[in-house]
């Protein structure tokens, strides 16, 4: 029997506000433990919350960008549970009436088809504190308690781990582009839980689901869902009874581990938050927020294809972050060679950024300098290989490429006469290579070209070298 997965994702995104959702404490990441706290976020007796207007604005903005309907009347609710990282013993969230409903994200499948993944709801809530487990015991840091979140709950429309990854990548790029969250998964500002079950292909009856936590990267998400799918299929095939449960992804051993049996909604005893009034959102406010939404990544990618003529794949990669998209667009316009700009950014520049673990905003050079480098290569002033060396220098120093070329004497040699002398000398000293070439070994020419480039320290024009080596070899 063939099975298919039924997957839904719950994504928590920390909002990029300066202060917490119900108090004036800073949301800055990385402070000394328990220094960004006050009576309100610690839940001390007599303290009263006050809803941060910017949080509501960001909730509306996210909803509009994700094609949701905005609930013009919504409220906050208490979710009651006891855990050390929850100082009030309840979390202020939204239960029955969230701020947004009924949206979707459109992803592109491997075969080029588009698929809509429904979004059931988006609700606002406060984050919990952070537990640090040591050999001596467990420590609690409440700096994160009260940091504003939106939780984006998808419908169970996802059928493969690969689709889940595409959905999360698209969601991350949208939230980053509208600047409601920095979406730094390594810092926990974008966290994803997955719900998965399996059913026979063609069936409409979902199986017993598991919730998976601790998936803090795209790779972890895909691996965890794949593992859990296989576990479910094996259990169902053997006739075992699956139970609804919460599991965590163990990265070190590449398995999911049981945490607890899954709670039900009534275990949390939700009821309206009495310290906060019902929230009324006007049409005027919604339209004001709508005007602040910039061009979204998929819209920008489509424009890049039409305007610059780059491949769709390039456009999708370049628009994953707005910093990269902006850098590309400025470089393409200034260099007047969009495809080459795309190649540099997706190739050598991305490789160097990964090696140094930096982002586009950390680069020491700007789009104008990269455009200048492209123009130097296109004009034949330097070769592509020399261009890579210049780029390495730009990464370290931030100097203009022209200055680097002049300082290091890297100008390309286009003098055919001078290059011909080197070619003749190389051929004369390597008779075996000529013999190999005559015997049909085409690689022998490449060997000779390499020797010429080495002799000229990479400064000879490669096109001229190739032409002259071929001409001289054929004369022999």
UniProtKB/Swiss-Prot annotation:
InterPro entries registered for this protein in UniProt = Asn/Gln-tRNA_amidoTrfase_suB/E, Asn/Gln-tRNA_Trfase_suB/E_cat, Asn/Gln_amidotransferase, Asn/Gln_tRNA_amidoTrase-B-like, GatB, GatB_C_1, GatB_Yqey_C_2, Gln-tRNA_amidoTrfase_suB_CS
What EC number(s) has UniProt assigned to this enzyme?
A: 6.3.5.-
**Annotated Gene3D superfamilies:** 1.10.10.410, GatB domain, N-terminal subdomain
- Keyword check for Ligase: yes
| Keyword annotations of the record | ATP-binding, Ligase, Nucleotide-binding, Protein biosynthesis
Record's catalysed reaction(s): L-glutamyl-tRNA(Gln) + L-glutamine + ATP + H2O = L-glutaminyl-tRNA(Gln) + L-glutamate + ADP + phosphate + H(+); L-aspartyl-tRNA(Asn) + L-glutamine + ATP + H2O = L-asparaginyl-tRNA(Asn) + L-glutamate + ADP + phosphate + 2 H(+)
One GO MF annotation is: asparaginyl-tRNA synthase (glutamine-hydrolyzing) activity
Query: Is this entry keyworded Cell cycle?
Result: no
> Which Pfam families does the record associate with it?
GatB_N (PF02934), GatB_Yqey (PF02637)
Gene Ontology BP terms: glutaminyl-tRNAGln biosynthesis via transamidation; translation
Q: Tell me its family.
A: Belongs to the GatB/GatE family. GatB subfamily.
Q: Its quaternary structure? A: Heterotrimer of A, B and C subunits.
The task this protein performs is described as:
Allows the formation of correctly charged Asn-tRNA(Asn) or Gln-tRNA(Gln) through the transamidation of misacylated Asp-tRNA(Asn) or Glu-tRNA(Gln) in organisms which lack either or both of asparaginyl-tRNA or glutaminyl-tRNA synthetases. The reaction takes place in the presence of glutamine and ATP through an activated phospho-Asp-tRNA(Asn) or phospho-Glu-tRNA(Gln).
Name listed for the protein in its UniProt record = Aspartyl/glutamyl-tRNA(Asn/Gln) amidotransferase subunit B
Which species is this record about? Answer: Clostridium botulinum (strain Okra / Type B1)
């Amino acid at each position: 029997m063939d099975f298919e997965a039924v997957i839904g994702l719950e994504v928590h995104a920390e909002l990029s506000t300066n202060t917490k959702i119900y108090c004036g404490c800073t949301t800055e990441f990385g402070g000394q433990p328990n220094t960004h706290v006050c009576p309100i976020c610690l839940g001390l007796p007599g303290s009263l919350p006050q809803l941060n207007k910017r949080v509501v604005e960001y909730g509306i903005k996210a909803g509009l960008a994700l094609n949701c309907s905005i609930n013009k009347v919504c409220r906050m609710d208490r979710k009651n549970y006891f855990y050390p990282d929850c100082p009030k013993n309840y979390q202020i969230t939204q239960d029955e009436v969230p701020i947004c409903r009924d949206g979707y994200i459109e992803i592109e499948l491997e075969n080029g088809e588009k698929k809509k993944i429904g979004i059931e709801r988006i609700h606002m809530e406060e984050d919990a504190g952070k537990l640090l487990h040591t050999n001596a015991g467990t420590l609690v840091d409440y700096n994160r308690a009260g940091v504003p979140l939106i939780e984006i709950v998808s419908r169970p429309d996802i059928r493969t781990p690969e689709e889940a990854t595409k959905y999360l990548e698209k969601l991350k790029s949208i939230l980053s582009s509208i600047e409601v969250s920095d979406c730094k998964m390594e810092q926990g500002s974008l966290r994803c839980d997955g719900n998965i079950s399996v059913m026979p292909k063609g069936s409409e009856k979902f199986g017993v689901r598991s919730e998976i936590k601790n998936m803090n990267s795209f790779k972890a998400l895909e691996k965890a869902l794949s593992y859990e799918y296989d576990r479910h299929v094996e259990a169902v095939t053997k006739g075992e009874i699956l139970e609804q449960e919460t599991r965590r992804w163990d990265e070190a051993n590449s398995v999911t581990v049981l945490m607890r049996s899954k709670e039900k909604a009534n275990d949390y005893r939700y009821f309206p938050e009495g310290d906060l009034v019902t929230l009324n959102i006007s049409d005027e406010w919604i339209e004001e927020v709508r005007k602040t939404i910039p061009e979204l990544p998929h819209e920008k990618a489509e424009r890049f294809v039409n305007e610059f003529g780059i491949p769709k794949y390039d456009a999708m990669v370049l628009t994953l972050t707005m910093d990269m998209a902006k850098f590309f667009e400025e470089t393409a316009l200034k260099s007047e060679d969009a495809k080459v700009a795309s190649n540099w950014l997706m190739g050598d520049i991305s490789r160097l950024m990964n090696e140094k673990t930096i982002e586009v905003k950390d680069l020491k050079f700007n789009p104008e300098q990269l455009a200048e480098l492209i123009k130097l290569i296109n004009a034949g002033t330097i070769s592509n290989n020399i261009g890579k060396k210049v780029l390495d220098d730009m990464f370290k120093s931030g100097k203009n490429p022209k200055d680097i070329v002049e300082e290091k004497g890297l100008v390309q040699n286009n003098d055919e006469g001078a290059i011909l002398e080197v070619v003749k000398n190389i051929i004369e000293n390597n008779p075996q290579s000529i013999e190999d070439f005559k015997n049909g070994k085409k690689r022998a020419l490449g060997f000779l070209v390499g020797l010429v480039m080495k002799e000229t320290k990479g400064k000879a024009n490669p096109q001229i070298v190739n032409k002259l080596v071929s001409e001289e070899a054929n004369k022999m």
